[in-house]
Amino acid sequence: IVMPGLVDCHTHLVHGGTREHELNMRLAGKSYMEIMNAGGGIHYTTTKTREASFDELYEKTYQHLNDFLRHGITTVEAKSGYGMNWETELKQLEVANKLQQNHAVDVVSTFMGAHAVPKEYKGNEDAFVKLLIEDMIPKVAKLGLAEFNDVFCEKGVFTPAQSRLILAAGKA
C-alpha cells in the first residue's frame, strides 16, 4: 500500500514547556496579545526553552515527531523563535538539525528569531531588529542551520517595515 505523507508546514517543534494553562484565558475572550503581555504566550515558552537543556529538548521533540509520524505526518517545518537570543536560537536549530539526521520524519528548519521582541529589548525594538539583521541571521546562514527565515508581523510585535528588513536580511 502506498499512501501520501502529510506535511506540517508551520510548527514550532523545538520548545520547552507547554501552554495548556492559557486555554481558560482564551476561552474567557482574552486576546493573544493580552495573554502575551500578562507573561504568557511566546514569552512564557521562551523562558522554558531557555531553561531547557539540549538533551531535554531533543528527547521531548523526538517523542513529538513519533506522534507526528503515527498520524501520517512525514515532513515538518521546524521554526525556532523561542530563544530570542543567540544561544537559545542556536540550541533550537541544532536540535532540529540533529532530529533531521536521526528521525524518519523530514525536518526542515526555519530561523524565526523575530518571533517576538524579547523582554530585555522592550522599548528598544529597533536594537533587536538590528541584532537580528547584523548578527543572528548572518550566523545562521554561515552555519547552514536553516533553509528559511520568518518573522511575526503583527501589531505590537514587528511592524511591516521591520519585517521587510528582517526578511530581506534572510535573502542576502
Regions found by a protein language model. Give the residues of each.
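Metal-coordinating catalytic core of metallo-dependent amide/deamination hydrolases
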Residues: 41-60, 66, 74-172
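Metal-associated gating/positioning segment near the N- to mid-region
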Residues: 1-60
